[in-house]
Amino acid sequence: MITMRNIWIMMLGICLFGCGAGKQPPSSQLSLTWKLEKDSVEARYFKNTFCLTNNGNKSLTNNWVIYFNQTPIYYQQPINAPLEIECLGSTYYKMYPTEHYQALPPGETITFTILSEGNVINVSSVPEGAYVVTTDEKGKPLQPQNVPIEIELFKPDVQWVSSRNSFPYADGNYFYKQNDDFSKPVDCDMLSLFPAPKKVEKTGGVSSFSQKVCLKFDDAFKEEALLLKSQLTSLLRCNVSDKDEETIIELKKMEVPITCQYPDEYYEIVIKNNRLTLKASDTHGIFNACQTLLALLDNMELTSSSLPNLHITDYPDMGHRGIMLDVARNFTKKADLLKLIDILSFYKMNVLHLHLSDDEAWRVEIPGLEELTEIASRRGHTTDEQMCLYPAYAWGWNETDTTSLANGYYSRSDFMDILKYAKERHIRVIPEIDIPGHSRAAIKAMNARYQKYIDTDQSKAEEYLLTDFADTSQYLSAQNFTDNVINVAMPSTYHFLEKVIDEIVRMYQDAGVELTAFHVGGDEVPEGIWEGSSICRTFMQENGLTKIRDLKDYFLEQILEMLDKRNIQAVGWQDIVMNPDNTVNEHFRNSKVLNYCWNTIPEQGGDEVPYKLANAGYPVILCNVGNFYLDMAYCYHVEEPGLRWGGYVDEYVTFDMLPFDIYKSLRRNLKGEPVDVKAASNGKQPLTKEGYQNIKGLSGQIWSETIRSFEQVEYYLFPKVFGLAERAWNVQPSWALSPDGKVYMDTKRKYNAGIIDYELPRLAKRGINFRVSPPGIMTRDGLLLANTAIPNAVIRYTTDGSEPTESSIQWQTPVVCNAPLIKAKAFYLGKESVTTVLFNR
């Protein structure tokens, strides 16, 4: 039975205990326990305790340092404490003995309680990846050893309430109320498809479908026909040939009979007399038709042995229907990335945006700049980052561990294979190299290159250097880095970027794939950068720049020009063309940059940014954090991994998105309070007629700070991505004009039923992980009531404090229950939900 909890615990074990692919070194004779004592002891702090135990047979002297990773927080050090915790950068910490430390005898434990700023909300916030480095009698560091951490997460009755988080905790009552919306039966047949076709007309009668299929196609559709044949064979066990059989599938060329914005994706399907005719004017359209056909056949397998005769007419409303995957923070291996491409193609998503570089790693080979992958694609124990980068996000000390998501990159050959595979499935891959901020990995790699050559060839050492060693600037990035911004006044910086861009262009060319867009990041450049660089001051004088921030505009202007000369559209996060005060940066008004609008939090005035840009003439992709950041936790529950700074995101929040009425897209604010959607747009900037034309698409984001396995990527995707896929294809739902009325709720219930009845079984059949919605439980008049948003799920519960399993009591009807603590789970298609807890007071 696969659960998110089991996946998390399994991956946590790998993070804490795992070593390299070779011989595993012995674990340390130390162990740690981390306890959250109380969340938000004061307005800004939570209290937590580290317990260090000596499991060896000798006293533990002061010749050790323990390193670990944790979501960036600020530890408040106690006075005269025996231990101290120091942040080495972002998520990387060390714990070491102070002058008040006394040797720890065998079998003894030292307890260290400390206040930390922020609040811990779930499993993604705990310490991970601990290891110890000891020194011998001469002070020489010995090989690192793993230190297991036991996590004593939360005492729910203590930690669930936070003074700074009024969002309701997802306990039994919370889920019961949520699930009540879906308790009524919904009529949902095999024509419930994602995304929904524009028009489905039943023409009467049915056509049988035989496992023996004759596949015919026009020459223009040969590649799509071969792929369809492969999918019919592998997914539906069909015997496909070109001989006449009872079932005939034909792919035919046609002229698009209507005016639509994206005629290359238009298609029709006609089913009649056991003949399934797919028609389109373009290969992309016929591919879309094939995906709809496969979905119909999947649904047919669940409900019938025949297909209704029908005529489907379909096309998308948005030309950009994308997913951004961060492979920099934690890596996604090539095989898993190809699986993701298949998954996206099922639902007619047509853009895969790969975040290939960031502060924590660089993930694509650049011939001639080997240090980017030899050093910056690996993380492990280091004091100078000359061989690898510091550890981050749970993976510990071993930079040679090929199973760790800390380590890895796409070789040139790998990347070209990915491009070809995506092209076959009509998915465009947009590479992102994030600059000038979020560039620490590249900076450290080029610093190491400098050190390698400086004694023998100064010119070669400085050729691609990205930092001014004399720069005294002090700054702190959003992720707590102090050294992650490249120096934009150095010629070597531009030489480096030209080299990187040209090598990536060459990979596309050699793969036979057109590179149409290149994402340059441009986000979260902190205040204080470049102020202490004499190189920058001289550069400003020479180029007539008056403010430090002008350097960023100058730099990005050069990069946009670099791409324009290569006929590549520049893409960037909204930060490129927005000023810090959320006004439009007029400097880029005439640029062609495509803007990803992400920081759209209403409480910070960010919800108006997309329409400000669109109205000003900038093309916009809606990436709204509150709707489409898929790595946000599903809900406020300790077992649900993910972040929450932008709110909680589930499959209903993605469904709620209204691209042309964006202010009505969120139904709760950051505090968890209900939003009056009717009044949400009052006083906000409306979308103009010109602005309407500049909304080019939607994109969901999966940042990987909290990712510990590819199964977790899938867990974040499903079922959240269904709302994204649906809204990108059908931008104006039937309920758009009455977003709080009966039409909205009826459509939402049908949406949920389609996911439960057809899409989750489809995913299970293909071995794709997904989240099972937890059951609701409550007591009334001494009876235990339960419900679920998944009618076919089995609910099991316990009353003794233990975790429910497949052998626990099954809830079927209200039952007498006076237990003070009740736990329940939903079981469905070989998977199970997180645990629902109810304190029955």
What are these regions (language model features)?
Residues 24, 131-316, 572-580, 761, ...:
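Acidic, contiguous N-terminal accessory segments
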Residues 40, 58-89, 128-131:
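Short acidic, flexible loop segments centered on an aromatic residue
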Residues 477-592, 600-605, 610:
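Active-site neighborhood of glycoside hydrolase catalytic domains
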